[in-house]
Amino acid sequence: MQDSSLNNYANHKNFILMLIILFLMEFARGMYILSYINFLPTVTSIAVAITSLAFSIHFIADASTNFVIGFLLKKFGTKIVLTTGFILAFTSLFLVIWFPASPFVIIFSAMMLGIAVSPIWVIMLSSVEEDKRGKQMGYVYFSWLLGLLVGMVFMNLLIKVHPTRFAFMMSLVVLIAWILYYFVDVKLTNYNTRPVKAQLRQIVDVTKRHLLLFPGILLQGAAIAALVPILPTYATKVINVSTIEYTVAIIIGGIGCAVSMLFLSKLIDNRSRNFMYGVILSGFILYMILIFTLSMIVNIHILWIIALAIGLMYGILLPAWNTFMARFIKSDEQEETWGVFNSIQGFGSMIGPLFGGLITQFTNNLNNTFYFSALIFLVLAVFYGSYFIVNREKAK
């Protein structure tokens, strides 16, 4: 009994420390990717094309690394992989201090940061306890969201004081996360040293076995990301609000999401499978309705209400969807499978803005992008709703 209690305490301590490490790395990512490089064209000679390329390469590196990181963790162990990641992130962001306007350094740092964050995410997802998955996944996604947003806001404030003087803060945050890692005992589901060909065959096998999940993983990210390029224009040109009022809408949505992740996500645990199905299906349908409604809104107060509803639903849909995916994963393939899932999700987030921007540009109508995003959630609702009904009938 005492050994069990000590083991539970150790697992809890490791989980909390990994949450803090995830928060710090996402904090650094928010500072650099969402704030620093976006402001560079306004305060230095860096061209917008360079920062846009850096932004894209960051997420390409992230998605590509996710595809193989689970296998690398099993082959080389967590210490080598994570330490390498911290070295890459720290070194690349440290270079920004000395070369704040170098196109090569800006792009290189973005790529290295994308690679470095990948193993931390995979370890977090594979270490969640099954009987507490909804609750713990709420904490994981909360740490991710809080880190990104606070990092972005914090760097925005520092840039207002001086555009490049506080660049050292980014590498400092990574260094703190790196030091904390040495107080964590990370355990994988198993270790193997299989040859590369065998690991490639396993990637193909994992992909084939989870094809049912890929539409949901890919299209959810694409549908949300498709709105990113048009939302600022929609807010300022259609609703005619200030940047501050638009920011308030984002903050309200973030607060709703945070509250849902911290308090509502635990509802997923110890509930029936049908309850989980209901949350997922309701989430897809509600998203479709809310996003479609955005195309007709011209009042900022109604927009704030919709932002709150979207945030609340997102905060419970993510853990529910994660729990649904987890039921398909073999216990000894946690790291590999979550890595592949994260990679597919990353590609969805990359193609979403591309489609959203192109639809608006070629149709010259912002509403068409809202219709596109809403249609995706309608397709997901029909596809997975049909699966849930068929699966429920088979279970009887």
From Swiss-Prot:
Mutant phenotype after disruption: Deletion mutant does not show a growth defect at high pH, but it shows very strong growth retardation at low pH. At low pH, mutant displays aberrant cell morphologies, including enlarged cells, defects in the formation and localization of the division septum and abnormal cell-wall shape. Inactivation of the gene causes structural changes in staphylococcal LTA but does not affect glycolipid synthesis. Mutants lacking this gene display a virulence defect in a murine abscess model.
Its membrane topology is listed as:
Multi-pass membrane protein
User: By what means is the activity of this protein regulated?
Assistant: Flipping activity is inhibited by increasing concentrations of gentiobiose, a disaccharide with the same chemical composition and conformation as the anchor-LLD headgroup. Not inhibited by other disaccharides such as lactose, sucrose and trehalose at a similar concentration.
Q: What is its main location?
A: membrane
Residue numbers on the Cytoplasmic membrane side: 1-14, 74-79, 127-137, 185-210, 264-274, 327-337, 391-396
Outcome after substituting residue 26 to A: Flippase activity is about half that of wild-type. Mutant is insensitive to transmembrane proton gradients, maintaining basal activity. Shows a strong growth defect at low pH
Ranges in the topological domain labelled Extracellular: 35-45, 100-104, 160-164, 232-242, 298-302, 359-369
Q: What does the UniProt record report as the effect of altering residue 144 to A in this chain? A: Flippase activity is about half that of wild-type. Cannot rescue the growth defect of the deletion mutant in the presence of 5% CO(2). Can rescue the growth defect under overexpression conditions
Superkingdom classification of source = Bacteria
Q: Where can this protein be found?
A: Cell membrane
According to UniProt, this protein's pathway is: Cell wall biogenesis; lipoteichoic acid biosynthesis
Tagged with keyword Metal-binding: no
Q: Which UniProt keywords apply?
A: Antiport, Cell membrane, Lipid transport, Membrane, Transmembrane, Transmembrane helix, Transport, Virulence
InterPro entries attached to this UniProt entry? ATG22/LtaA_families (IPR050495), MFS (IPR011701), MFS_dom (IPR020846), MFS_trans_sf (IPR036259)
Outcome following mutation: residue 314 to A: Rescues the growth defect of the deletion mutant in the presence of 5% CO(2)
Entry's Gene Ontology molecular function annotations: antiporter activity
Extract one GO cellular component term from the record: plasma membrane
Task: Extract the coiled-coil ranges from the record.
Answer: none
Q: Which family does it belong to?
A: Belongs to the major facilitator superfamily. LtaA family.
Q: How does it assemble?
A: Interacts with YpfP/UgtP, LtaS, and with numerous cell division and peptidoglycan synthesis proteins.
Summary of the function given for this chain in its UniProt record:
Proton-coupled antiporter flippase that catalyzes the translocation, from the inner to the outer leaflet of the cell membrane, of the lipid-linked disaccharide (anchor-LLD) that anchors lipoteichoic acids (LTA) to the cell membrane. Displays high selectivity towards the headgroup of its substrate. Plays an important role during infection. Contributes to S.aureus survival under physiological acidic conditions.
What name does the UniProt record give this protein? Proton-coupled antiporter flippase LtaA
Q: Which organism is it from?
A: Staphylococcus aureus (strain NCTC 8325 / PS 47)
Q: Which gene encodes it?
A: ltaA
